């Protein structure tokens, strides 16, 4: 079945009577692709930030997540603030990158101390370097972090010390207000449908616990 994001945008497209064409891209290239008019919609677990809002508009939130820290089993680190000066792996351009760089990604989000950031195209590459001792930690979305640790349970562990909730939104071409309003209308309607019929979430969209499946190509 489709992952949460793909199922969501397909449902929105169906409700708007629009054909949805899916393009897989590296996360860091998405906003640039929108600015060059190669795409007009981004749904990729993207958090709304002030910096991104300079380039794109955002819909209302459709999913809430947190960041997590992946560590080696013997690490003494227990919270984000203890990453000060540590070598931290992140997926380039993601919220984890923003946090590890000591920057805010929202008004209500805590700022952590600045780390020695090492950026990767794929989350799996950061985890590999962690296992090999090249870095001290990986900061990444909680859902893929859980999967990485589950697959490396003898060597890795997970710490969730949220810098604040992050809200996934759909990015839209700057200034396309009518399109944004229509997408917001459909997000609200789909949300009500899921709440009214919990079984629909599993049948049509997968459960929230499986939503990260859609991001596998980005992380692995």
Task: Give each language-model segment a name.
Residues 1, 86-93:
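Short beta-strand->loop
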Residues 25-28, 47-48, 63, 72-75, ...:
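Solvent-exposed coil/turn segments that connect beta secondary-structure elements
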Residues 17-19, 35-44, 86-87, 122, ...:
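Alpha-to-beta junction loops
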Residues 71-88:
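Flexible hinge/capping segments at coil-to-helix
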Residues 29, 46-54, 99-102, 129-164:
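A ligand-binding cleft/hinge motif common to bilobed small-molecule-binding domains
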Residues 95-118, 150, 157-159, 187-220:
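Ligand-binding clefts/hinges and TM-proximal coupling segments of bilobed small-molecule sensing domains
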Residues 1-46, 119, 183:
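Extracytoplasmic small-molecule ligand-binding "clamshell" domains
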Residues 63-71, 142, 146, 150-187, ...:
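Periplasmic-binding protein-like
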């Amino acid at each position: 079945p489709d992952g949460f994001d793909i199922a969501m945008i397909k449902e929105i497209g169906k409700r708007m009577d629009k054909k949805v064409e899916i393009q897989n891209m590296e996360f860091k290239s998405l906003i640039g692709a929108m600015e060059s008019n190669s795409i007009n919609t981004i749904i990729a677990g993207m958090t709304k930030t002030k910096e991104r809002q300079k380039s794109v508009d955002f819909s209302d939130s459709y999913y809430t997540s947190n960041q997590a820290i992946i560590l080696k089993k013997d690490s003494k680190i227990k919270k984000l603030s203890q990453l000060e000066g540590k070598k931290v792996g992140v997926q380039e351009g993601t919220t984890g990158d923003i946090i590890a760089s000591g920057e805010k990604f929202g008004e209500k989000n805590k700022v952590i101390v600045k780390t020695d950031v090492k950026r990767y195209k794929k989350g799996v590459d950061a985890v590999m370097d962690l296992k090999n001792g090249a870095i001290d930690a990986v900061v990444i979305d909680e859902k893929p972090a859980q999967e990485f640790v589950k697959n490396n349970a003898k060597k890795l562990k997970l710490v969730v010390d949220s810098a604040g909730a992050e809200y996934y939104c759909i990015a839209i071409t700057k200034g396309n207000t009518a399109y944004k309003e229509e997408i917001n209308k459909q997000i609200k309607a789909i949300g009500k449908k899921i709440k009214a019929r919990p079984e629909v979430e599993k049948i049509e969209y997968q459960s929230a616990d499986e939503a990260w499946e859609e991001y596998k190509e980005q992380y692995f």
